[in-house]
Amino acid sequence: MIGHSTQEKIEKLVQSCGCNLYDLLLLKENERSILRLYITKEVGVSLDDCAMVSDLISPLLDVEDPLAGEYFLEVSSPGIERPLKRPAHYQHALGELARIKFADKNEIEGEIEAADETSVKLKGEEPIPYSLIKKAQTFYRW
């Protein structure tokens, strides 16, 4: 697990590149440990942005050594269809389409009209408290 102070340092380094830290995940895929950073930027994330963030973060991780053993660092954009986990994610996605799943297996789709610290509102629907949401993500209608 990444400590709070290390995560704050990572966030500051990402911001120094003109980007924002969207999410940070520690996963295991095919027996490999992966530290995956998702970054966003107002005008979109480029490959150069990802490389710059990776180059800045790597020395910090070498010193802080937040993970036991070998791991791979991956830096990318969360993509057009991205998970919504925090109020800031919903606020950043105003006007976008979202699919929200509830614990009772029901789901709803719609355009995000408003979001605050406690709930999200889809166009034509009542506000939905985050506590009722099991999983949510933006989606693009192709």
Swiss-Prot record:
The protein's name = Ribosome maturation factor RimP
Subcellular compartments: Cytoplasm
Q: Which controlled-vocabulary keywords does the entry list?
A: Cytoplasm, Ribosome biogenesis
* UniProt entry tagged with the keyword Cytoplasm: yes
GO CC annotations on file: cytosol
Report the protein's function. Answer: Required for maturation of 30S ribosomal subunits.
Q: Which family does this protein fall into?
A: Belongs to the RimP family.
The answer to keyword Glycosyltransferase applying to this record is no
Q: What is the lineage of its organism?
A: Bacteria, Pseudomonadati, Campylobacterota, Epsilonproteobacteria, Campylobacterales
Q: In terms of domain of life, where is this protein from?
A: Bacteria
Q: What InterPro entries does the database record attribute to this sequence?
A: Ribosome_maturation_RimP (IPR003728), RimP_C (IPR028998), RimP_C_sf (IPR036847), RimP_N (IPR028989), RimP_N_sf (IPR035956)
Q: Which GO terms describe its biological process?
A: ribosomal small subunit assembly; translation
